[in-house]
Amino acid sequence: QNIAVKLLEAIKYPNYDDVNLAPYHSSFDARNSALSRRTVQIYQELGLWSALQEHATPILEVNITEQGSFGKARLKAEQEKVESFGQVIENAWLGRVLLTEVQKQPLIELIDGVQVTQLTQDADMAYIDASRGEEQLSLQAKLVIAADGRDSFCRKALGIGASEHDYDQVAIVTTVQTSKPHNHVGFERFSSLGPLALLPLPGEYRRSVVWPVKKGTEGEWLGDENDQHFLDALQDTYGDRAGKFQKTGKRFSFPLSQVLAEKQAVGRVILMGNAANTIH
């Protein structure tokens, strides 16, 4: 049975009639996502992976070490009899491919630049009031899927409580260039400053960095004037396994916390994604 969908998005999107019309170039400041093997399988089943993999890199090996310790753990996809442990993809490309596909679907209406102002429901229907600039929208549906983030307006509008745990850390996220190729190896390095993750990216010398640090200290690592300081800290913590850390992109910081909704479904509304369960 065909189901008509209205997709409400808070941000304003560009119009991509065809993903191939405008050339895409990898950005050194691009943010990235690590996709699990199951997520990749879902995109394959949807017929989207052939486009997505153009700017994705498989993780074929994972090395885990601790600063000051000789021991290490090494996992290889080949030995585990899997194609890979997952894929790392640039968020900008992931969003572009998915948006292009959404705009091709006749049963999906994308309404962007929207702010939901009210969500109510009765036994038969859910009702949404929203604003889009000066325009006021009133919508109703038999099912609402709310995926509006860790601070979900929809969750609060429904009176659903949530337990929260603050880890007192922020994650520094960026892209770096190293003198040695990554060879599709992901690394996790435990140090006194926190666990450092290095993931392979398209381009054999580019890696994604995720480095949790104590909340309040992130200013030391952000800003263009701190580029060399950040690279030096990476070098000191990680050693020469990746060669020399030569270049860093813009650093982003994200607070680390857990938010778990007390309920994930109420009446005709389902919470999904970070609105239901945020881990880090």
Q: Can you describe what each PLM-predicted range is?
A:
Residues 124-127, 250-259:
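Short gly/ser/thr-rich secondary-structure transition/capping motifs
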Residues 52-157, 165-170:
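Conserved N-terminal helical subregion
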Residues 151-186, 205, 215-217, 235-238:
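Central beta-strand plus flanking loop segment that forms part of the substrate or channel wall
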Residues 254-280:
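Conserved mid-domain beta->alpha element of the FAD-binding
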Residues 1-60:
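Glycine-rich FAD cofactor-binding loop and adjacent beta-loop-alpha segment at the N-terminus
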Residues 15, 148-149, 279:
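Glycine-rich, N-terminal phosphate-binding loop of Rossmann-like dinucleotide-binding domains
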Residues 34-37, 79-100, 218-226, 256-260:
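Short beta-strand to alpha-helix junction loop
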Residues 191-255:
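Conserved FAD/dinucleotide-binding core of flavoprotein oxidoreductases
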